[in-house]
Curated annotation (Swiss-Prot):
This is Protein phosphatase 1 regulatory subunit 3B-A. The keyword Ribosomal protein does not apply. GO terms for biological process: glycogen metabolic process; regulation of glycogen biosynthetic process; regulation of glycogen catabolic process. InterPro entries: CBM21_dom (IPR005036), CBM21_dom_sf (IPR038175), Pase-1_reg-su_3B/C/D_met (IPR017434), PP1_3B (IPR030682), PP1_regulatory_subunit_3 (IPR050782). GO terms for cellular component: protein phosphatase type 1 complex. The N-terminal region is required for binding to PP1, the central region is required for binding to glycogen and the C-terminal region is required for binding to PYGL. A motif (PP1-binding motif) lies at residues 58-61. The lineage of its organism: Eukaryota, Metazoa, Chordata, Craniata, Vertebrata.
Amino acid sequence: MAVDIAMKFYLRSPPLRRDRVECRIARKSNEPLRPCIQTTDKTLLSELSNQENKVKKRVSFADSRGLALTMVKVYSDFDDELEIPFNISELIDNIVNLTTVEKERFVLDFVQPSADYLDFRNRLQADSVCLENCMLKDKALVGTVKVKNLAFQKCVKIRMTFDSWQTYTDYDCQYVKDTYAGSDKDTFSFDVSLPEGIQSNTRIEFAVYFECEGRIFWDSNKSLNYKIARQDHRIPSNFESRHYDPVCMSVDQYGSPRCSYGIFPELPTYSGFDKLGPYY
């Protein structure tokens, strides 16, 4: 039995060797070999080739082709007037008028005399006349004047110039009936309209005078005159630029308007009511 088994294995070995040889020999094929590395897409290659085939842009100047380097165009005036819509023309007129009004805007170039009540009272007592308050309203100067009641017949006037005192005009003040009878002071009011076309290089000034029993009393703002200036030409007064030293000032226990105006300008003293007319 052992011999038979050996023979069987021997007879079967050659086919195994033949199959091994067939596996080692690769079959030849006519198809081209494909690379194992993936190449660029065909569409991308075609785009690159098209870009290379395109002609590059070039810059050329007009003079190299016999043309002029500059071009001049001449426009003639319109034969017919340009028609502007009504709303636009009205807007332009309003802008021009607004600019003119801003240029002719005036302001008072002095401090209201009644802002400092103690000084106002002393001036009235010494000069017998003093401007109380005034304001500019619709290109008109309006205000009040206080005078001492020296006699029944009185004449109070405003002397005003619009051309730096080359000429001047006197304007009458009207008597204002006092609420309290028997007062030793009288009140007069005035309303002076400012003329049109005032020159920008001239000064507008005024003073107050009071005639009584053949005597004349003047209030010329301590010989400085009361000035009206254009808003862009206004010069700050010494009163506005004055600095108060709180250490050197004593507080008035009775709440004097002088003290309140100097240290506490936000408090509602007489300085805040200078446009309301007489206050006594």
